[in-house]
């Protein structure tokens, strides 16, 4: 169960304005339902899930590890999910290595050293088949495989996830191919093979799918979150700070940053997302939040139940929640508006539900801002600049 509290620590005048904003709910829902880009709200289908799961089992049975090559919406969701449930001092049972976010030569050199004695499979993910970083690193790894096994054997180490529009990547030989539907934008593609295939190597994706669709019951909560965020922006709160108290959720906040920044940040509008880990950042950014420029509001992501470890007759989770309650009280007294999202527990099922909730909220906020929630024209600007320089050099 996910609960959203926007009434306890939000200025009363904003809550009064929200009563009027609720009248726009039907308008926003109509825009959403009429969009051609909400394939992510439809059921993926059991046959697709089975195909993904069977391919993941093949990878686990035939390779030492999976190297996921992608960037942005192509992999942030699965990476964030995987990191959230990783043991602090122990890796997942099957190794999944995520690459594609940097073109650092040191990183790529270290990657080859890491893979030197491993029989690895590549899952290259790019909806357009044109993503520069993905093309470069995929070619880099293909060259390594060619040296090891010969050019004709590379295809036996590759799984491709792209759209079925005949792009360069769509024509690459491989073990298996998965399509990202045209009616799903990259950052909304959590319930496609782009994310489910890497996750299926270590998680029960049937449980992920079930939890995800439970988020469709949170339309009212999602609109409440979108509406309050929109009004806070109208009152000069142009930065949203996602506050977490579990370090493994830092990657999840990176996914949130991409989701909301790419959805809203257009036409001079949008809320800038940032994140803090408490209690760590109370000793740095906490000073700014308490007494600095009042340009931000906070969204706390909490969960009630956690592993119980006792300390002087109190369990650590209770102490942690007491600290968070104190932080919320202090920041609110310091004139920072605070929203709270609470899960019963940090579980695979509930986090999947939370993913749907956030995607629904992001799209609703986009409509409130009057922008298209599903495009990212600003990102395409840098891509065109790079294309002019490197397009002839980098091909699949």
Whereabouts are the PLM-identified features?
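Active-site phosphate/pyrophosphate-binding segments
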Residues: 149-298, 378-396
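Helicase-primase coupling helices
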Residues: 274-348
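Short helix-loop-beta junction
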Residues: 84-94, 144-147, 259-270, 330-334
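Glycine-rich phosphate-binding loops that contact phosphosugars or nucleotide phosphates
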Residues: 57-219, 384, 388
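A short, well-structured juxtamembrane/interface segment
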Residues: 44-60, 221-233
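Extended, charge-enriched "interface" segments that sit outside catalytic cores
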Residues: 1-57, 326-327
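Generic C-terminus detector
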Residues: 352-353, 360-396
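Hydrophobic alpha-helical scaffolding
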Residues: 45, 98-101, 127, 131, ...
